[in-house]
Structure formats: C-alpha cells, structure tokens
Amino acid sequence: KQPHMAPKDKILFYKYLDKASVYFEYGSGGSTYVASLKPNLKQIYSVESDLKFLNTLNKLIEDGTKGMSVTPTLSWLYIELGTKYGDWGQPHKNCPEHQKISYSSQLGNLKKTEREKIDLILIDGRFRAASCLKCFQYIKDDCVIMFDDFLNRTQCYGVVLDYYDIIEKTEDNRLVVLKKKPNIQKIPLEIIKKYELEKS
C-alpha cells in the first residue's frame, strides 16, 4: 500500500502528490493506492497492463476508501500486453508491436480538456522513455513529471534530458522531478519512434 520507491524518493513523491489536483501515472501500485486517499486530488488516471493486478488493487482501493466523504475519481487505462500476473507489467514475447506502442500513447488518447488539467505525472511502468517523450506535446509547461529509477538507468532514459530539465532529486539517486525545457516546441517523431518498443 506504499509506492515501491527508495525512502527519500517516496517523501519527494508525496510532496508533489499533496500539491496536485489531477494525477496521471504509467504503472499502478502503491502510488495508486496512496493517491486514492488524497482529498486534494480530483482525478487519477492509471495505465496498467496486468489485469489481475489491476483488479486486486482496485478492490484494495475500494476497501481503503470506504467511508471517506471526498475521494478522487479513478480511471483505469488497461492495455493488453499478455502480461503474467506479478511480472511488473512486462509484455509477453508474442505481444504485437501496436499494443506495445499503445501503452506509451495513453495520455495522448485523452481529450484535450482532460489533458490540460493534469498537473502531475508519474512514469513508473513499462516503455518509460517513450511515455515521457510522448507526454511533451500534450502537457502544460508547469506540469510536473516524476520519473522513477531514472538516475540509476540513465543509459536507458537519458534521452529525455534533451527535452526536459531536472528540477529536483534526492540523495537516493533514482527518482527525478522533470519539467519541459522552455525553448523546445516539439520532439521529433523519429526520436519517439526509436524508443517506442524499448520496454524498460
């Protein structure tokens, strides 16, 4: 019922979660549970590829929020990747490419009016580099992106620093807080396509 994060990173995540109003996450879990208890949040969008895990977590959230007068609206965005239960959302080896690409495209599938209200995004699922790169064209300049396991995997994810600035991190050296670089209009499509099938 807690996010799977390093201790100081967890504190940093809670700091931004407490200030948000509409929260979007790639990869559900303890972060979703904690967010569902936050009265400041109006809406949660959660992308998940493990249906059994999603259903188990949804039941925990329903039980945990019983009796609360104000809770966020939770919208599940389920993507079929042939994932085995408890395998961190890993796509099956026979999963079609279009389904893998669909995972990182979920924020773009929301209505413009919905996207514009999002002020906090957590990247903590699969296809992380592509998910972060695809967010760029849709989010407001003041939207915050929190990217877990970034600093210990910069060889996988470092490309995002061509388009985002790190505005905060902790000595745990994993989670980073990102905002869009102010002088960039869009990310070239060929850069995004290069990372769409990178499942890490």
Would you name each region that the model predicts?
Residues Q2-H4, V22-E25, D124-G125, C156-Y157:
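A short linear-motif detector with a strong N-terminal bias
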Residues I44-S46, G64-K66, C95-Q99, D141-C143, ...:
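Short, low-complexity, polar/charged sequence segments that are solvent-exposed and flexible
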Residues L110-S200:
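C-terminal substrate-binding/active-site "lid" region of AdoMet-derived donor-dependent transferases
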Residues T71, I79-Q99, V144, F150-L161, ...:
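Glycosyltransferase catalytic domains, chiefly GT-A lineage
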Residues Y14, L54, N58, S104, ...:
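Generic detector of well-ordered alpha-helical segments enriched in charged/polar residues
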Residues H4-D87:
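SAM cofactor-binding core of SAM-dependent methyltransferases
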Residues L74-K134:
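Internal catalytic-core helix/loop-beta-alpha segment
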Residues K1-F13, H92-Q99, I184-S200:
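N-terminal donor/sugar-recognition subdomains of glycan-related enzymes
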